[in-house]
Amino acid sequence: MKEQGLGIREQGLGLLFCCVFFVALLSLAARAQGIQLGDAPAAAHKEHVELVSDAVQVMAGSPQMVELRFRVDDGFHINSHTPKDELLIPTELRMDAASKVKVLEEQYPKGSVFRLPLDPGNPLDVYQGEFRVSMRLVAPKGASTLVGELRYQACDNASCFPPRTLRVMVAVTGE
C-alpha cells in the first residue's frame, strides 16, 4: 500500500514537471515568433518609425506644399498607404482638425516591392528607410504647430509587431 502512495506522488511530480516544461517551451516559442508575454522587454515595445521633420516655414494664408519625413529602422518595413492585401494595415497620417494649420491634401509615396524570404511569391508594398508624405496646407501668420498621428505596423522578416501610433508634432512658421 505504501508503494502505491509513492507511485501516485511520483506521478503527480512527473505531471507537474511536464506542465512546467511545456509552459517554458511555449514561452520560448512565443519569444522566437515575436509574441509579447507579460512585461518581458522585446522589440515589440520599440516604435521602429520616427519623425525626422521638425519645422517648416511657409507663406502665411496661402496653400503650400510641405513634406514630412519619416524614417523606418534598419531591418524593418511598414506597409505602404495602399498595401496589396486588404488584411494588411495601411500606413496612415491623421492630422488634428482643430489645429490652426489646415491640411488640404495628403500625398503618400509609392511603396517599394518587398518579398519575404519565407514567401517570395507574395510581394508586399512597403516603406523602408526614409519615406516622405507630402501635404498641401495653409498656415496662419506666426508660429503654429501641425499636430497628428502616424498609424502603422512595423514588421521584420519573421513577424509583425502590434500596430503603433506615432505622435506627430511639427513647428510651422507662417511668414
Question: Which residues are covered by each model-predicted region?
Answer:
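Arg/Gly-rich low-complexity intrinsically disordered repeat tracts
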Residues: 2-14
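Bacterial N-terminal signal peptides
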Residues: 14-31
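Extracellular/lumen-exposed scaffold segments
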Residues: 31-175
